[in-house]
């Protein structure tokens, strides 16, 4: 009997379980299927009866006042090449539509985002946007709230790529001002008036943003009326924010390599003049590396006509690197010229001495012959004039031979002595660093003040 009881117990449990599950489902079905009404909810169908969403509130009367507020979620990308930035914002708009007011409760209604399609909305657009899109994951990122007096709060999440005119003359020591312009596309100031919300004293989220290349230093709000001859005046609200470029990454990636390349080119001043391959290869390598650095740095920038501060510094470094190569060419030319001049002096000096000796011997022989002929002529009582002329000509020729020796004290070449190559290197070791330091002081003072 006990064994039979234990066998029947599971069967009894299986029989009773469906009964409880069915009862639970019936309870849920009763709750869902019941015609439940909340007493304070307004009758939306009654509010929307006769509502014309194609016409603004109070048409024919004063313009609709629309309050705007912004909350910045992120600034994703800032491009100097395209002169644009990408920003994700929450745009809050608030206005009063008396057609939707209700008075039997003071509660604010939070409505489904699909209800937006039934309402009149301001046709706000971003004037300087290149592209924009709404977010719809997991549902459309829209919020709509209705207050008893008919005030509607409409909030949407937008990501937009916005144009920003940049002045890159001081790049990368520059500061840029970018704007986000909001305006009505079709309604003029006679139909709609925009103003910044009273709560918009600061932009939430903007002070917490961490950008890779920039720091947001300040921002401000402006309101103006844009006058179009063909359409009238349109209200425009603008957000201006200042961006200061972070210079640290550029000092590491551009300025420091340039300085090191210039310093590397000075190493050749301590290399011997005889080591021609070493000095030439070092000079050419630094010049080519500097060229590569200039090209790579300019690849991410727009091809603007303005000369940027980074370009100026690159060219300063390029001139110093190239000047170091030219210095070796000049020093090597002087060293080679001195060697050739010394070799020429060694060859011409014995020849000049031999010419002088020959002239002296010739002069002596000529003088002896003339003296002998003079003695004979005196005995005969006559002195021919051609003998005296030849005597003088031989004497003058001998003097010329003696005074026109190459390299004599009165020669022009003796006064134009070439500078020693080692002396040029010694001067370059001091002049190049001093000149580079002076140019850097002028450069940084001009672009940072």
UniProtKB/Swiss-Prot annotation:
Q: Could you list which ranges are Extracellular topological domains?
A: 25-251, 299-308, 447-449
Residues exposed to the Cytoplasmic side: 272-275, 332-423
Task: Offer an example of a GO molecular function term for this protein.
Answer: transmitter-gated monoatomic ion channel activity involved in regulation of postsynaptic membrane potential
Alphabetized InterPro entries for the sequence:
GABAA/Glycine_rcpt, GABAAd_rcpt, Neur_chan_lig-bd, Neur_chan_lig-bd_sf, Neur_channel, Neuro-gated_channel_TM_sf, Neuro_actylchol_rec, Neurotrans-gated_channel_TM
Q: Name one GO cellular component term.
A: glutamatergic synapse
State whether keyword Transmembrane applies: yes
Locations listed in the record: Cell membrane
S-S bonds: 164-178
| Signal peptide segment | 1-24
* Listed transmembrane segments: 252-271, 276-298, 309-331, 424-446
Q: Which GO terms describe its biological process?
A: chemical synaptic transmission; chloride transmembrane transport; gamma-aminobutyric acid signaling pathway
Q: Which residues are glycosylated?
A: 103, 106
Under the heading PANTHER family, the entry gives:
NEUROTRANSMITTER GATED ION CHANNEL
- What is its biological role? Delta subunit of the heteropentameric ligand-gated chloride channel gated by gamma-aminobutyric acid (GABA), a major inhibitory neurotransmitter in the brain. GABA-gated chloride channels, also named GABA(A) receptors (GABAAR), consist of five subunits arranged around a central pore and contain GABA active binding site(s) located at the alpha and beta subunit interface(s). When activated by GABA, GABAARs selectively allow the flow of chloride anions across the cell membrane down their electrochemical gradient.
Q: What is recorded about the protein's domains?
A: GABAARs subunits share a common topological structure: a peptide sequence made up of a long extracellular N-terminal, four transmembrane domains, intracellular or cytoplasmic domain located between the third and the fourth transmembrane domains.
Q: What is this protein called?
A: Gamma-aminobutyric acid receptor subunit delta
**UniProt organism field:** Rattus norvegicus (Rat)
């Amino acid at each position: 009997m006990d064994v039979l009881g234990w066998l029947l117990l599971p069967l009894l449990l299986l029989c009773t379980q469906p009964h409880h599950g069915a009862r639970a489902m019936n309870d849920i079905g009763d709750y869902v299927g019941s015609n439940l009404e909340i007493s304070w909810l307004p009758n939306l169908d009654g509010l929307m009866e006769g509502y014309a969403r194609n016409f603004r509130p109070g048409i024919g009367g004063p313009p609709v006042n629309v309050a705007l507020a912004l909350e910045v979620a992120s600034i994703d990308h800032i491009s100097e090449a395209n002169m644009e930035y990408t920003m994700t914002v929450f745009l809050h708009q608030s206005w009063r539509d008396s057609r939707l007011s209700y008075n039997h409760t003071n509660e604010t209604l939070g409505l489904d985002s699909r209800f937006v399609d039934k309402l009149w909305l301001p046709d706000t657009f971003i004037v300087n946007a290149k592209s924009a899109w709404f977010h719809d994951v997991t549902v459309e990122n829209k919020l709509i709230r209705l207050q008893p007096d008919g005030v509607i709060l409409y909030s949407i999440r937008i990501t937009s790529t916005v144009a920003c005119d940049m002045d890159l003359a001081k790049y990368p020591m520059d500061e840029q001002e970018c704007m986000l312009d909001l305006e009505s596309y079709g309604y003029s100031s006679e139909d709609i008036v925009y103003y910044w919300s009273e709560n918009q004293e600061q932009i939430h989220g903007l002070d917490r943003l961490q950008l890779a290349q920039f720091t947001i230093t300040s921002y401000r709000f402006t309101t103006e009326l844009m006058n179009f001859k063909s359409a009238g005046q349109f209200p425009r609200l603008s957000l201006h924010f200042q961006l200061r470029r972070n210079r640290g990454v550029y000092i590491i990636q551009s300025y420091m390599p340039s300085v090191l390349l210039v310093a590397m080119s000075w190493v050749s001043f301590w290399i011997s003049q005889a080591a021609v391959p070493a000095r030439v290869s070092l000079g050419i390598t630094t010049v080519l590396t500097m060229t590569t650095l200039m090209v790579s740095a300019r690849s991410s920038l727009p091809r603007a006509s303005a000369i940027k501060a980074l370009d100026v510094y690159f060219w300063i470094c390029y001139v110093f690197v190239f000047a170091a190569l030219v210095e070796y060419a000049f020093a090597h030319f002087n060293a080679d010229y001195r060697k050739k001049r010394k070799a020429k002096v060694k060859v011409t000096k014995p020849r000049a001495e031999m010419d002088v000796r020959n002239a002296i011997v010739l002069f002596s022989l000529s003088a002896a012959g003339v003296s002998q002929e003079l003695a004979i002529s005196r005995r005969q009582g006559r002195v021919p004039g051609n003998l005296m002329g030849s005597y003088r000509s031989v004497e003058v020729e001998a003097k010329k031979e003696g005074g026109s020796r190459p390299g004599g004290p009165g020669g022009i070449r003796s006064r134009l002595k070439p500078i020693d190559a080692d002396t040029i290197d010694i001067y370059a070791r001091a002049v190049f660093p001093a000149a580079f330091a002076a140019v850097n002081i002028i450069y940084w003072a001009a672009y940072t003040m």
